[in-house]
């Protein structure tokens, strides 16, 4: 449990804390955390992972309140099931079962996540803070 919390939550906090020093000097910036749909909907056998990813949401919202007046935004991008080396090892039956849970009926690509992160990092997203942006094909809608 602690290893997952340390990697996903404590690690993110330490990086954000260090980055914030420079952002405060600039009086602008973006903190972008990569969460997961599992942080909103949970997953059997994944209490540690779900806790670590949902913790990012509270952390981003706290940073948003604390740093917003200084021109710094904080948001979470929350992917669903993603085409990765890890998910490619799943057999076709399991992949189909997972995809059937997703309203769009497929896994997300890494590029689709990167596009959202790029937008959140841009000036066009300057008025978005404290948000969790799902990139999950509708899997977590309503959460």
Residue ranges and their predicted role:
Residues 1-5, 98:
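Substrate-binding pocket helix/loop in short-chain dehydrogenase/reductase
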Residues 103-113, 124:
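A conserved structural motif in NAD(P)-dependent oxidoreductases
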Residues 16, 52, 60:
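Active-site helix of classical SDR
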Residues 41, 118, 129-143:
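Short C-terminal tail/terminal secondary-structure segment
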Residues 28, 68, 73, 128-130:
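Short, small/polar-rich loop/turn modules that mediate ligand/substrate recognition or access, typified
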Residues 21, 65-69, 126:
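Alpha-helical segment proximal to the catalytic Tyr-Lys
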Residues 36:
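Residue(s) in the substrate-gating loop at a strand-loop-helix junction
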């Amino acid at each position: 449990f602690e290893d997952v919390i340390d990697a996903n939550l404590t690690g993110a906090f330490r990086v954000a804390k260090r980055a914030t020093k420079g952002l405060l000097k600039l009086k602008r910036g973006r903190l972008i955390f990569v969460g997961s749909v599992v942080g909103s909907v949970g997953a059997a056998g994944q209490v540690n992972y779900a806790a670590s990813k949902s913790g990012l949401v509270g952390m981003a919202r706290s940073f948003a309140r604390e740093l917003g007046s200084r021109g710094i935004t904080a948001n979470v991008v929350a992917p669903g099931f993603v085409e990765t080396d890890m998910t490619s090892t799943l057999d076709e039956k399991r992949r189909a079962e997972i995809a059937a849970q997703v309203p769009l009926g497929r896994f997300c690509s890494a590029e689709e996540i990167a596009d959202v992160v790029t937008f959140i990092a841009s000036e066009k997203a300057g008025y978005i803070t404290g948000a969790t942006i799902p990139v999950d094909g509708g899997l977590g809608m309503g959460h």
